[in-house]
UniProtKB/Swiss-Prot annotation:
Annotated source species: Aspergillus oryzae (strain ATCC 42149 / RIB 40)
Main location: membrane
Described purpose of this protein according to its UniProt entry: Acyl-CoA ligase; part of the gene cluster that mediates the biosynthesis of 2,4'-dihydroxy-3'-methoxypropiophenone. The first step of the pathway is the conversion of acetate into acetyl-CoA by the acyl-CoA ligase ppsA. Acetyl-CoA is then used as a starter unit by the polyketide synthase ppsB and condensed with 4 malonyl-CoA unit to produce the pentaketide backbone. During polyketide extension, the polykedite chain is probably reduced and dehydrated by the KR and PT domains, respectively.
Catalytic activity: acetate + ATP + CoA = acetyl-CoA + ADP + phosphate; propanoate + ATP + CoA = propanoyl-CoA + AMP + diphosphate
Cross-referenced PANTHER family: ADENYLATE-FORMING ENZYME AFEA, LONG-CHAIN-FATTY-ACID--COA LIGASE
Protein name according to UniProt: Acyl-CoA ligase ppsA
GO cellular component entries: membrane
């Protein structure tokens, strides 16, 4: 990091690196484009929220949990929380009470900000289970975002209505009340950067695909370094569209830094739906967006020959795909739908590491194997270690799979309550198996998820990629199940048909896979048709959940036979 670079997140965001029209919007509501914020308005809103949180006696290092869907207010809340000296943590607004209770136990927040439609779930978690008067979290520490337009009106009105706030939801606090304390500057660091490295800024919940989520703590320094790693100048004006959740680490990085630091407009949607997504790209001339593999499949299955869809996507120049494994073939299909100068590429990262690999924008003549998750980004070191457990480092090995280990300035500090996460030299074991070829890295799968078939290691990711090529398959997931004689694991596929009326038979699926894979990779565990595959908000398959459903299915079959 340059010695003149600000070391706290808020200063870093507002250290604008571009000449721009200060009256132009930097954050735009994709569903209601007239709802937007300029850089000046955004900065004012952040300082107002900091003043309001300060009035609530928020102490340095306390956690504030944000339980909201994407909106143009979300980045302001994040920066205000960090700016007052607190620690941000986000929660999925669709979390069940059980899931939210787990996050509350991790975060131990001093204040919760939720929405009108999600307040009831929060109250289930914060009220005493006995129905008594004692609350787990006092009612005056649960604040509600009732109406975005009301917040914007209050923030920028010359005569804000100080009677607002307590009136909404009776004794629940409306966050407009936070806007009635004037403005207050954010906390900065007055040393050479050491405080930035040890001061927590945010906690992000890990994916929870193989167990309960943990809270990964990230410092100011780590988040700034993560942004520096992914920032890359491009030869076109950048307007971004984001449908990924802002409570997710990658969504937060995109929404926080790019609009403020580089005056690059960001259009926000609450989630991915095809029609609003295409409309936002077309209306705003979006040049960059970020997709999960599930979103890619929706796009390429939605009449890819349609001229109207192709026209809607024509302004795109860079599409970054990540969050879960994907094969090169659907990426190439998406590439073929875009402008000749567009680039579709993968990225790989974790909550704990941020984005470590990425293929950045380049012209088609210089493009790469789309099956790769990319090259190592600046600020990181990586190595592959023998998966047998010997600890042997696979130095410069080509196409030999090994467990990925990472170190660098963008790594998380620790899991909350679990300080030890790296070895003595700072290497973090990711649990992902990869191989490298010509400096590009390729994902094989998770070590825990590899299926051991009669001595062979079978990657469910590989089988899922082949299943996705079947013309009658919409989605699929593969897990290992124990053979009836207990001698081996066998691959079992859960398949979502493109149409139940024309679904393939299990035999069709078996034959399709036999023609494409080695014998030990056959779906000897069976094929099960389902309505949907359980995935997390980033698109990753929740294999623990799928295994639980599989166990229930086997028990039911045993009862009926």
């Amino acid at each position: 990091m340059n010695s003149n670079t600000p070391t706290d997140i808020v200063s870093f965001c507002f250290e604008t690196q571009a000449d721009h029209n200060a009256t132009g919007p930097i954050l735009i509501d994709g569903l209601t484009p007239t709802r937007s914020l300029t850089l000046h308005q955004f900065r004012q809103l952040v300082c107002q929220l900091i003043a309001g949180l300060h009035e609530q006696k928020i102490q340095q290092g306390q956690c504030i949990l944000v339980h909201l869907e994407n909106s143009i207010l979300y980045p302001a809340l994040f920066l205000a929380i960090v700016g007052v000296g607190a620690v941000y943590m986000g929660a999925h607004p669709a979390s069940s009470a059980t899931e939210l209770e787990h996050l509350l136990s991790l975060a131990n927040p001093s204040l919760i900000i939720t929405g009108r439609d999600t307040l009831s779930t929060v109250l289930q978690c914060t009220m005493s289970p006995s129905g008594g008067k004692k609350e787990k979290i006092p009612s005056d520490r649960v604040w509600v975002l009732n109406d975005i337009d009301q917040v914007l009106c209050e923030a920028f009105s010359s005569t804000p209505d100080a009677s607002m706030g307590d009136a909404a939801y009776h004794h629940r606090r409306d966050i407009t009340k936070l806007l009635h304390s004037g403005q207050r500057p954010w906390r900065t660091f007055d040393d050479d950067g050491q405080k930035s490295k040890i001061t927590p800024a945010a906690m992000f919940a890990t994916s929870g695909t193989s167990g309960l989520p943990k809270a990964a703590i990230l410092s100011h320094h780590a988040l700034i370094q993560q942004h520096i790693s992914i920032h890359h100048p491009v030869p076109y004006p950048v307007t971004r569209l984001l449908t990924l959740p802002l409570f997710h680490r990658y969504g937060a990085l995109v929404a926080l830094f790019f609009p403020t630091r580089y005056a690059q407009p960001l259009i926000l949607l609450p989630g991915f739906q095809l029609r609003p997504f295409l409309s936002a790209i077309h209306v705003h001339g979006v040049t960059e967006t970020y997709l999960s593999p599930a979103m890619v499949h929706i796009l390429i299955q939605s009449t890819p020959q349609s001229s109207s869809i192709r026209e809607s996507l024509r302004s795109l120049r860079y599409v970054c795909v990540g969050g879960a494994p994907i094969d090169s073939r659907p990426l190439q299909s998406l590439q073929d739908m875009l402008h000749p100068e567009a680039c579709v590429a993968q990225a790989w990262g974790m909550t704990e590491t941020a984005t470590v690999f990425q293929d950045r924008y380049c012209l088609p003549s210089r493009q790469f194997d789309k099956g790769s998750v990319g090259v190592v980004l600046p600020g990181y070191q990586v190595r592959l270690v023998d998966v047998s457990g010997s600890g042997r480092v696979l130095d410069n090995a080509t196409e030999i799979p090994g467990e990925l280990q990472v170190r660098g300035s963008g790594l998380f500090t620790s899991y909350k309550g679990h300080p030890d996460h790296t070895d003595g030299d700072g290497w973090f074991s990711t649990g992902d198996v990869m191989y490298q070829k010509n400096g590009h890295y390729f994902l094989v799968g998770r070590m825990k998820e590899m299926i051991k078939v009669r001595g062979y290691q079978v990657s469910p990711v590989e089988l899922e990629a082949e299943l996705a090529q079947h013309p009658l398959v919409k989605d699929a997931a593969v897990i290992g199940v124990l053979a009836t004689d207990g001698s081996s694991e066998l691959p079992r596929a859960y398949v979502v048909p493109l149409s139940w009326a024309e679904r393939p038979s299990p035999e069709d699926i078996y034959d399709f896979m036999r023609q494409r894979l080695a014998g030990y990779k056959f779906l000897e565990g069976g094929v099960v048709f389902v309505d949907s595959i359980p995935r997390n908000s980033g698109g990753k398959i929740r294999r623990t959940k799928l295994s639980e459903l599989d166990d229930q299915r086997d028990k039911l079959i045993a009862l009926l036979t």
